[in-house]
């Protein structure tokens, strides 16, 4: 009987090609993950009152707050603005990572939340 129990050797020699493609995809994905560390996302909320800079790996690098939005009598508004900006930066980082990875995987589904 042929290898793998299939006539003609199973995949007809394509198994080596599949393995090579999988290894290349893995290397490409590792490189893309490293590249995401160097890509930045900038988010502004409240008409520029709060600015956030984050990496494609969801690391917040900078938060800038305009002094005029710091009101000791309305701390809750400042907290809401910061929360909104951080969440938007994280959402954009996810979009960037998904976009970069889909370039490598060719849009293959089934890998959500991998990055």
UniProtKB/Swiss-Prot annotation:
SUPFAM superfamilies: YbaB-like. One of its GO terms (molecular function) is DNA binding. Pfam families: YbaB_DNA_bd. NCBIfam families: DNA_YbaB_EbfC. Homodimer. Binds to DNA and alters its conformation. May be involved in regulation of gene expression, nucleoid organization and DNA protection. This is Nucleoid-associated protein Ccel_0243.
């Amino acid at each position: 009987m042929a290898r793998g129990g299939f006539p003609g050797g199973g995949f007809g020699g394509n198994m080596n090609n599949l393995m090579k493609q999988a290894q290349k995809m893995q290397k490409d994905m590792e490189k893309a993950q490293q590249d995401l560390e160097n890509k930045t996302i900038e988010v502004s909320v409240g008409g520029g009152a709060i600015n956030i800079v984050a990496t494609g790996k969801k690391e917040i690098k900078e938060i800038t707050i305009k002094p005029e939005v710091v009101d000791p009598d309305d701390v809750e508004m400042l907290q809401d603005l910061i929360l909104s900006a951080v969440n938007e930066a994280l959402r954009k980082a996810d979009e960037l990572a998904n976009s970069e990875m889909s370039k490598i995987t060719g849009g293959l589904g089934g890998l959500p939340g991998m990055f």
